[in-house]
């Protein structure tokens, strides 16, 4: 089961206690999943979803708000490998649509839900829960962080965006062909959104995966950094040994000043030690900077010999 489906199944079990919150969430389903038709010269509303647990929730909300329903299950065959659930409301559809603001008194269709249904914080949370259940998607946190809300039209998308801004979310509004969608890629904001709509179990799972992922990434960065440092140190040591061997061949190490001869012999005996480790073997011990200074002198001597200025 995908992480998005797990999250939706968790949310589908939340039935708001307040009737105002039930109506706010139901309004999201009517707008996002609803399809209007005519039956016996009357308006018929059909809500379609492939999610059985969401269909059950919508049925409960409609029943709690006094609407009679009929449910149909349509098998789309082996190619689709899933059923679709149709919840039909055949009575008082015009009253339902007018109540939510989707039809005005003159019978004109509107793309926005009545603002009175989402003026309270508790109702806004239920409304956003419905929006996510009806049109949301969420990547598994083990991959890229991405939460998306697919919406039926731009006017409704802007209304949803306005509600989200009240909670300081920074969803971006884009279009995929002609369909608008809002999306988030920030992990902290995705966690806040899950908390807002009541997906607490999914929030904990998301956070656990995120922590493990970030620790693993941090370890990888440290390993990569350490590997780069080791490669650099090995390259430097090889260059130092080549310079020392060249000096020994051309003029002999006995012709070096004692401090340089000492560090040269120490490097030849310990090709794998760092500058700091070499410094600790000297008497008295020498800092990393001091050791590096001596090797710079040896490098200059080797360069002078190669250029014929010494030897």
Curated annotation (Swiss-Prot):
A Pfam family of this chain: WhiA_N
GO biological process terms, semicolon-separated: cell division; regulation of sporulation
GO molecular function: DNA binding
InterPro entries hit by this protein: Homing_endonucl (IPR027434), Sporu_reg_WhiA_N_dom (IPR018478), Sporulation_regulator_WhiA (IPR003802), Sporulation_regulator_WhiA_C (IPR023054), WhiA_LAGLIDADG_dom (IPR039518)
DNA-binding region: 274-307
Superkingdom in the source lineage: Bacteria
Protein task: Involved in cell division and chromosome segregation.
Family: Belongs to the WhiA family.
Record-given protein name: Probable cell division protein WhiA
